[in-house]
Amino acid sequence: MIPVIIGIVVVVVIVCAIAGIYNNMVTKRNRIDNAWQNIDTQLQRRNDLIPNLVETVKGYAKHEQDTLAAVVNARNAAVSATTPEAKMEADNVLTDALRQLFAVAEAYPDLKANTNFMQLQATLEDTENKVSYARQSYNDCVLSYNNAIQTFPAVIFAGIFQFKERQGFEAAEAARQAPTVKF
């Protein structure tokens, strides 16, 4: 009788341990999905601001059609991207295009003094800060999840339960390079 009870207790402990490992991996995966939704929300907010910014700049920078077209095209690509990987890539392209647009705006003092432009620029900067924070949160969640599924004993069950490694959000190549300062 005692060996049966010990056997039942051992089985219950093993099942509870596996359930705990599984629940931990599910929780971490769900945190990644939630963090991605936070990024997506901020990217959508930024995408909604861009048409107003482009219209404001058009009136002042008539000779900068290539830059404006690059921003519009990058925004359209970002809006139409469907997978997280495609959105990450499109976001990097859009961030670079916006950086170029604001560099062009420096050459137009009247544009820089325009109240609407200043408000849009401030709102975009605020949104960029929120996107940056959301990316950091996402990457933290991805790191925690990847560590969880790659360490023992969870690594044994991660494959069985189809938990796959996730990729973090990487900065665009242009963002990695230090800006050139000339005096």
List the model feature ranges, each with a label:
Residues 1-183:
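A helix-centric hydrophobic-segment signal that preferentially recognizes long
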